[in-house]
């Protein structure tokens, strides 16, 4: 299981399938991003929304469509928030039903470069960028670097507290030792 660090439901499904078929289960964890002193760290989408509700300025949300509902309780969210999500028809429709439409709904497939993240922050005059700590594979550092370059505050939603598994290096060693690879 090398899924996204926030894909808890997928991980449960994989683990259950392995248990049901008596197949060994191994999880490979993405390395967390580097700590950034100028960022605001929060434990959940709700805490991020509460924090942002006390601020002024536009916000680029890069957390994905499944998290958007947690931001709809914010004052003036339809004018302040710019949501970047996958450009799938069902995703765009679900976002529109939450009130994210027009220029406030950006449909694209990532990960994105620092330059493209910075261009979006400038285009929408965003003072904040909200992201999950997706690690290098999720373009995390490029988002943080772009935010800092644009004088936007990165708001980072921490990973689930209980992550079990092994690093990529540990996984390679394990596979070599146990499967003669």
Model-predicted regions and their roles:
Residues 94-104, 108-119, 123-124, 128-150, ...:
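A C-terminal functional module that forms or caps the active site or interfaces directly
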